[in-house]
Design a protein with these regions (language model features):
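Short acidic (Asp/Glu) and glycine-rich catalytic loops that position anionic groups and cofactors
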Residues: 57-59, 147-149, 174, 219-221
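Short His-centered aromatic/hydrophobic patch
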Residues: 198-250
Length: 251
């Protein structure tokens, strides 16, 4: 059976899980917390991982199939269901959301999770193997500072990311304003899957839809709750939630 190397609550990993589950691909998920994932990911990638402005050569998800491996969420979606990439417009939107949306919804989520005492530990306890979750209790001060530095999780970074996410949310709302059910027309594509998965950190889908357990909204700060509620009410957030409801199937 194939193995999927993940950071379980990562929205890029959710994108890959969604596609694999939708296509009925059998796999066993190997879950790692940030930092704990580096060695297993490098080993699984077998030199195929790539570093860019938003990821490293040890980035997840990685799908391991015997002696072969596929690195990156879009490559895994394409492997699972090639027909989802049905036009150049779909290809362009997937690339745009990967590069211009995903890093910013991630930063917004980490701004609130790392800023709220006990929230990152709750995320680990709910999703990671017990040994890793226990080890995090000792490693969290160092790991938290490294995550903040690597992902530029600070107030100016958060505010920049809100501007970026708002802009893409407004683009999506405008695209859907003519009444079309999906971003490129009448058919669900990789663009819809990618947008919904990468928007998920700011709408927090429930565990019956998302492939990991995200923190309940009541544990967030007042600012965090207001941010999530604003994105849930936005037409783009409503569209993302509808994609989860209509198209996200469990394994």
């Amino acid at each position: 059976m194939s193995e999927l190397i993940t950071i379980p609550f990562s929205h890029y990993c959710e994108k890959a899980r969604w596609a694999l589950d939708r296509a009925g691909v059998e796999y066993e998920e190997r879950r790692y917390l940030p930092g704990f994932h580096v060695r297993p990911a490098r080993r699984a990638a077998r030199g195929r991982g790539r570093a860019d402005a938003h990821s490293s050569a040890a980035s997840t998800p990685i799908l391991v199939m015997g002696a072969d491996s596929i690195c990156g969420s879009s490559a895994i979606v394409r492997h699972a269901e090639p027909a989802l990439f049905s036009s150049p417009e779909v290809e362009a939107l997937v690339e745009r959301y990967d590069d211009a949306l995903g890093p910013h919804t991630r930063r917004i989520a980490y701004w609130f999770i790392l800023g709220q005492r006990g929230l990152f530990q709750r995320l680990a306890d709910d999703n990671a193997p017990r040994a890793q979750a226990w080890a995090l209790r000792l490693a969290l001060p160092l790991l938290g500072s490294r995550l903040r530095a690597r992902l530029k999780v600070d107030r100016p970074g958060f505010e920049r990311s809100v501007v970026r996410v708002d802009a893409i949310a407004d683009e999506v709302a405008a695209q859907l304003a003519d009444g079309r059910p999906y971003l490129t027309g009448d058919t669900f594509t990789a663009a819809d899957l990618t947008f919904a998965a990468l928007f998920s950190p700011v709408i927090l889908p429930g565990p019956d839809r998302y492939g990991a357990t995200l923190p309940p909204l009541e544990l967030f700060s007042d600012e965090g709750r207001a941010t999530v509620e604003r994105y849930r009410a936005h037409p783009a957030g409503q569209f993302a939630a509808r994609m989860f409801d209509a198209h996200r199937r469990g394994p």
